[in-house]
Amino acid sequence: MPLSGTPAPNKKRKSSKLIMELTGGGQESSGLNLGKKISVPRDVMLEELSLLTNRGSKMFKLRQLRVEKFIYENHPDVFSDSSMDRFQKFIPTVGGQLGTAGQGFSYSKSSGGGQAGRSGSAGQYGSDQQHHHQGSGSGSGSGSGPGSGGAGGPGGHSGRGGALPDNQAGGEGKHITVFKTYISPWEKAMGIDPQQKVELGIDLLAYGAKAELPKYKSFNRTAMPYGGYEKASKRMTFQMPKFDLGPLLSEPLVLYNQNLSNRPSFNRTPIPWLSSGEPVDYNVDISIPLDGETEEL
């Protein structure tokens, strides 16, 4: 007799053919693009800092802006065109040339006896960009690139300089641009030149003669009554009462009984009643018949 109600559905067995196709297809599809695998932690950090989606990247960007603002506000004369003449003493003597628009200087030194053109420039805040140019050939010559200092060529507007082509440069050598964008505020205030800095030894811990401070009268730490002390003494109407002090009498020394047995005990431990030390006699009648039976029984 069949049971009443809806019969349970038959459980279908999952086919393993589909699983085999998926596992086998992964080996054949070698052209699948899974993206770039970043294995260097530095790339990951730079990518996260450039997204500006989390709090850390925003704080990093604000810190960069604060640093640039601090450098520009504390040394505004360094980045102005009118003050670039002061940097002439920092330029090397070999092939040096100052650029005013790009705010940098360039020099070149070659091993083949010649000097090749070298240029460089700094950005808005004096970024130390270095441009290398390898010169090859024979002969000697000297010159400056069309973008020297960022003023003589197309590299002047964007803050980048250019160098001479290979066919115009003579000798072989490595050209490096050096930027002097930091000036110590101590050296700037004292007017010390680089030559004097080597010869002169400055001891910043040596203190000079201390100037004598003016002797001002301080009213903050003095408790002065209203009107001064003279008026305050006249307004004083309270007088201390006069009383006769009797002779000083020494208090009698009280000796307490140090017998520990007579001292009361305030311990919380339940202690039974103790005797006072006197012998206690109990009269017990021991005239009991030895028989177990008496006359009453």
UniProtKB/Swiss-Prot annotation:
Compartment(s): Nucleus; Cell projection, Pseudopodium
Main location: nucleus
Biased amino acid composition, Low complexity: 118-128
Gene Ontology molecular function, alphabetical: actin binding; FATZ binding; telethonin binding
Keyword field: Cell projection, Nucleus, Phosphoprotein
Gly residues compositional bias, start-end: 136-162
Modification Phosphoserine occurs at: 82
Cross-referenced Pfam families: Calsarcin
Span list, region Disordered: 1-34, 105-172
Highest taxon, organism lineage: Eukaryota
GO CC, alphabetical: actin cytoskeleton; nucleus; pseudopodium; Z disc
Function: Myozenins may serve as intracellular binding proteins involved in linking Z-disk proteins such as alpha-actinin, gamma-filamin, TCAP/telethonin, LDB3/ZASP and localizing calcineurin signaling to the sarcomere. Plays an important role in the modulation of calcineurin signaling. May play a role in myofibrillogenesis.
Subunit structure: Interacts with ACTN2, ACTN3, FLNA, FLNB, FLNC, LDB3, PPP3CA and TCAP. Interacts via its C-terminal region with MYOT.
Family assignment from sequence similarity: Belongs to the myozenin family.
UniProt name for this protein: Myozenin-1
Organism name: Bos taurus (Bovine)
